Amino acid sequence: MTAPATNLMGTYLPAATFVRGRGSELFDDAGRRYLDFVSGLAVTSLGHAHPDVAEALCAQARTLWHVSNLYANELAPEVATTLDRLIGGGTAPAGGQVFFCNSGAEANECALKLARKWAGPGRHVVVSTWGSFHGRTLATLTATGQPAKHAPFEPLPEGFVHVPYDDLDAMAGALDGGDVAAVLVEPIQGEGGVVAPSSDYLPGLRRLCSERGVLLVCDEVQTGLGRTGRWFAFQAHHLRPDVVTVAKALGNGMPVGACWASAEVAAAFGPGDHATTFGGQPLAMSAARATLAVMERDDVCARARRAGERLAGALGSLPGVRSVRGKGLLLGAELERAAAAEVASSALGRGLLVNPVRADTVRLAPSLLVSDAEVDEGIALLGAAIGEVLAG
């Protein structure tokens, strides 16, 4: 047998090897500089190696890393209180409770279990949408509305139904059976192409769920914590979900996830119903506490709105870009032809990280602290890449 080139499983196709980061910049193993408009898939929202987060981690690492959830620590309740307030809009608490975990998939798994426990026997179905992405575990993969990702792992768990995104009539029909526990939805579909629904969609879902006694679960793993110009994307629609899942930006690169639920729904869980070894540990919570503190201090929501307007406007003026979708600093540039992978590759060669999320769409998710000069530099590099590819 021929020895593998690496002892890592072949689940990824890395395009570069990075060894250092600073703000919106990355440096590879040859010392070359790149401008990062991927942010680790909307994770490093404060940029790489943010000094406040780095200092918090170093200080905590000298004190206490981990004790398991057999015991309490001082940081987790504090971070939960901050999250609850931000879900309430930033000024007043939402009155819910938080379960900490390690990733977006784990946060969504928690939400799925909580929904089933809350709904009780006979009501176990979760309705999600085509084009969605909710994780890679078997349950969250099944909730994900992308059949190509399902095929290699069938048979999948039962109890999941998919309907078209932004279609209230289809959703109403799916809720008619009486066996539905929850609706799971992204306020903006990220992996599905940065697709924002019509303005009446989320309010319509809230109304349908309230009428049918079904939980509304908002997956804010990618859209949450300032990315779209609000603390959470659902807040643009003046509603309150029953459950909100959070991860990615919460630790600015440290693995941290969270599932928030209203007090009534959270009460369905009792001791032993759900658990995690690492979730909520002091080291991860120190990163989350520092990250949230910087986000509030530096008003990342306002910064995302302002920088997003600049970036979206410049994207829309680039030759070869048909349209720009998204909000704040979660944007998708739809190209005039299906060449997103080639454009991303050309951009990387020029020193810019973007990623293709559909055959014709490149996603941009820079740091929420990105400067005007960095936005302009990114646009110039992307424009050159698009011009090169579409001219070929």
What does each model-identified segment do?
Residues M1-G392:
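Conserved N-terminal phosphate-binding loop of PLP-dependent enzymes in the Aspartate aminotransferase
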